[in-house]
């Protein structure tokens, strides 16, 4: 009698059998089974276990792991799953890996470190675990094959430069709890077509979406008070812009070169309006009452008219290269006419030639040489 291990084909328990017999009765479930089948089942299962152990050992050799942090990946596989003991992907762990196409992160991974996947130009897909809490700065910058990203539900911020220059990124889905989108977060994502900024976002950093050339619509939520410098600059397809009542300031070049913008409605309560330089699609622009400062509108080559409230006393920028801008409604225009070159060179020059007041076009009193309309003294 030669006793060997087998697995009962009925209950799955491991039992010892006589390999010379044709049949055996399981001592656990009292069910008879064919001996050769039970022996083969045992061999197959343990062969598979051995193969998996071998694969894990081989796979593990590609990883450098310290205290649960995946410090470095040294392999060249196209698909990688994080080992079970990993709770953080360390800084630079996969940086500039050009063979990696797919990454699977298990539920214990809570943090992806800075620069972790930067320059992984072949990376097409990454599945984030639901419990992921943070993706640090520059983590996926330059992942030019990445097309779709779904941010997991517990993340509260998008760090600086996280997805910058992901030139083939088409869509990004944010969870509602996101409160901050960092500087340069999606800068240079020239194929990004759709974004829906969550209602709890209060900060959109500078250059956050600059160079997103296919982005057509943006709605800024109520909690955002400042649109930072160049946040949406060079979004050349942007044609629909919704600005909330919570906005107090539009920063320098915030919408620079958004050439598809035709109409922009600035809500009341905005104190400073800047950022529309090079918006060649604008024909008319109204600055709301209460605004105290406006900035640079130069290179708005098709702008024909602008309305500015009396609360604005001076302008810090200019309207150079606005050749069509002749219709200006502003009570303080007289003191600032030089900032409107087209207006100054045509309207003011013609008034001088006609002997009229350069400020309002009125006639002068004969003796005092003061304007009968605005009271300004003739100074030319």
PLM region spans:
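Residues immediately within or flanking Cys/His clusters that coordinate Zn2+
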Residues: 5, 23, 354, 368
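Short cysteine-rich clusters marking metal-coordination/redox-active sites
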Residues: 8-11, 26-29, 357-360, 371-374
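Short, intrinsically disordered terminal segments enriched in charged and Pro/Gly residues
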Residues: 22, 38-58, 341-347
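Short Cys/His-rich micro-motifs in 6-15 aa windows
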Residues: 30-40, 375-380
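Structural signature of tandem-repeat unit edges
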Residues: 57-66, 74-88, 98-111, 121-134, ...
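Consensus positions within tandem repeat domains that build extended binding/scaffold surfaces
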Residues: 91-93, 113-116, 136-139, 159-162, ...
């Amino acid at each position: 009698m030669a006793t060997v291990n087998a697995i009962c084909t009925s209950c799955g328990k491991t039992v010892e059998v006589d390999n010379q017999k044709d049949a055996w009765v399981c001592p656990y479930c009292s069910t008879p089974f064919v001996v050769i089948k039970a022996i083969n089942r045992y061999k197959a299962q343990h062969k598979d276990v051995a193969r998996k152990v071998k694969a894990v050992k081989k796979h593990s050799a590609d990883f450098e792991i310290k205290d649960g942090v995946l410090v470095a990946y040294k392999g060249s596989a196209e698909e990688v799953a994080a080992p079970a003991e990993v709770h953080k992907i360390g800084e630079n762990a996969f940086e500039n890996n050009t063979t990696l196409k797919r990454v699977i992160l298990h539920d214990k991974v809570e943090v992806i470190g800075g620069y972790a996947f930067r320059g992984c130009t072949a990376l097409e897909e990454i599945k984030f675990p639901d419990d992921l809490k943070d993706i640090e700065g520059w983590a996926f910058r330059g992942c030019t094959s990445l097309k779709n990203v779904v941010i997991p539900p517990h993340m509260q911020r998008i760090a600086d430069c996280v997805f910058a220059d992901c030139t083939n990124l088409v869509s990004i889905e944010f969870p509602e709890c996101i409160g901050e989108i960092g500087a340069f977060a999606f800068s240079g994502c020239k194929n990004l077509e759709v974004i829906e900024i969550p209602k709890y976002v209060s900060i959109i950093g500078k250059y956050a979406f600059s160079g997103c050339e296919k982005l057509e619509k943006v709605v800024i939520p109520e909690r955002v008070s400042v649109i930072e410098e160049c946040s949406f600059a060079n979004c050349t397809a942007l044609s629909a812009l919704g600005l909330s009542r919570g906005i107090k300031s539009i920063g320098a070049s915030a919408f620079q070169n958004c050439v598809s913008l035709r109409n922009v409605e600035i809500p009341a309560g905005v104190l400073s309006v800047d950022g529309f330089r090079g918006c060649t699609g604008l024909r008319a622009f109204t600055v709301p009452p209460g605004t105290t400062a406006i900035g640079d509108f130069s290179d708005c080559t098709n702008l024909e008219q602008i309305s500015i409230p009396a609360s604005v006393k001076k302008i810090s920028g200019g309207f150079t290269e606005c050749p069509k801008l002749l219709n200006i409604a502003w009570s303080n225009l007289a003191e600032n006419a030089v900032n409107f070159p087209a207006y100054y060179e045509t309207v003011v020059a013609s008034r001088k030639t006609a002997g009229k007041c350069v400020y309002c076009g009125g006639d002068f009193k004969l003796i005092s040489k003061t304007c009968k309309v605005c009271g300004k003294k003739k100074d030319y």
